[in-house]
Regions:
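Short, flexible active-site loop motifs that bind/organize anionic cofactors or intermediates
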Residues: 9-12, 42, 114
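Generic alpha-helical hydrophobic packing signal
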Residues: 7-8, 22, 49, 53, ...
């Protein structure tokens, strides 16, 4: 499986809520981070492999994902970049919004060794605030 296919498989597993499958694609020393200033969203911050399930748990506990569409994906030998349209409704506030996500994936020996995700942090803060 190539790197783009691996990222697509991760996205399919995310859509199915299958964190165990996602974990199988990660190297033991993965450096995982949803990069953002502040801590308004519980999925923000850097994580080790052991902490990655908490990233997905925080999303599942707080959001109903209403749209997840890969708009563009490109790769070189080690990296995959993806642009995603993401729609969400925050369970606690009932507020909904849509944004563009940017994901950078780096691979070594077929495993994810680095993930960086960015999102519209201002919109996220607005949606999470009652």
């Amino acid at each position: 499986m190539g790197n783009i296919e691996t990222v697509q498989a991760v996205y399919e597993a995310f859509g199915a809520g299958d964190v165990d499958t996602i974990m199988g694609f990660l190297a033991d020393d993965v450096d995982w981070s949803a990069e953002a200033e502040g801590t308004v969203a519980p999925w923000y911050g850097r994580r080790t492999k052991a902490e990655v399930p908490a990233f997905f748990q925080a999303i599942a506990e707080n959001l109903e994902v209403t749209d997840f569409e890969v708009l563009s994906i490109a790769a070189n030998d080690t990296d995959v970049m993806a642009v995603i349209r993401f729609g969400e409704t925050v369970k606690r506030t009932g507020k909904s919004g849509s944004m563009t996500l940017h994901h950078w994936w780096r691979f070594r020996d077929g495993k994810v060794v680095l993930y960086r995700g960015t999102e519209d942090t201002a919109l996220t803060a607005e949606l999470l605030t009652p």
